[in-house]
């Protein structure tokens, strides 16, 4: 079966993607697409990107054999792709560097970004400081409450954080505000979008910058095991760490599992199952799977993890779901939290709650596989930012009512 791995001339993967933006934004989108295509074929740009990934972020990140976790679960050998060890503690910095270098190349002096968990905001603020650019970060009021530490980090790095109380005050609302701001300041400002979403060329750019994850996994597993893994597992919100993990393996005989956040359960209205329970629609400039009611109104997404409560999933993921190339599965709040607690005790690594959704699925997958088989799971970020949430969960006696 032929898999489409690049957008068509209108910016679509199959029927997903496109450029659903107001006319006023089209010149900026066209300018960005052209600049990105030029940069992509420029060896100097690639060199510069790789220089900062190595010297500033600390790449490559290890691919660690999780010996104790493998023993505990029985079955497949489990390797961890350690994106938690990047500077700033998550995968978000890979994309922030790429886009900031592109913005500089385009002569932009200012950046605007949205953030949910605050990790993309922190990565953007870090890079804005490094490259001496102004940054405004829009963040939902609800997320600000959950992620006080990251708000302080962004401000310490010199960014201006603007609270968004529209809607339910989460990531989706922050994206709306960031897009509006960009429309009005497009001459000197680049919109540093943090996930594989939005109008073309954003999903492709973000995927390309994050593909360093999957490319490293490929060379690392070949040198450690002499072959490709049998399965890759990553959590999915908008979908940037997962698309970066999966993309280099799309044409290979490797099973791919994207783990969505089932929140309080798929039988409730409190989940973020864009593929599991959603249907195609348009949001934030792109056609993709969305959680919506019968009238096509976007429903509010819920997850205990601030980075996964987005009501959509990027267009490339939407396409891979339809053609059956990636299996989209899910983990509830409780399943993710229990996996986080187990994994921390067994491996001495406290993952972000987002990443714990992926681990929760590994706990189901590994025991049903042969011990000669190999799973690689992407630990998209570290859990420092989630201490308050984890503490509350444990104080409430663990399992929340579902």
Curated annotation (Swiss-Prot):
Residues with PTM N6-(pyridoxal phosphate)lysine: 92
SUPFAM superfamilies: Tryptophan synthase beta subunit-like PLP-dependent enzymes
Pathway: Amino-acid biosynthesis; L-tryptophan biosynthesis; L-tryptophan from chorismate: step 5/5
The keyword NAD is annotated on this UniProt entry: no
Listed Pfam families: PALP
Catalytic activity entry: (1S,2R)-1-C-(indol-3-yl)glycerol 3-phosphate + L-serine = D-glyceraldehyde 3-phosphate + L-tryptophan + H2O
Top-level EC class: lyase
The EC number(s) this enzyme carries: 4.2.1.20
Cellular component per GO, a single term: cytoplasm
InterPro entries, sorted: Trp_synth_b_CS, Trp_synth_beta, Trp_synth_beta/beta-like, TrpB-like_PALP, TrpB-like_PALP_sf
Cofactor(s) the protein requires to work: pyridoxal 5'-phosphate
Keyword Amino-acid biosynthesis set for record: yes
Keywords: Amino-acid biosynthesis, Aromatic amino acid biosynthesis, Lyase, Pyridoxal phosphate, Tryptophan biosynthesis
Molecular function GO labels: tryptophan synthase activity
Subunit structure: Tetramer of two alpha and two beta chains.
HAMAP family, alphabetized: Trp_synth_beta (MF_00133)
Purpose: The beta subunit is responsible for the synthesis of L-tryptophan from indole and L-serine.
Protein family (similarity comment): Belongs to the TrpB family.
Protein name: Tryptophan synthase beta chain
Organism of this sequence: Staphylococcus epidermidis (strain ATCC 35984 / DSM 28319 / BCRC 17069 / CCUG 31568 / BM 3577 / RP62A)
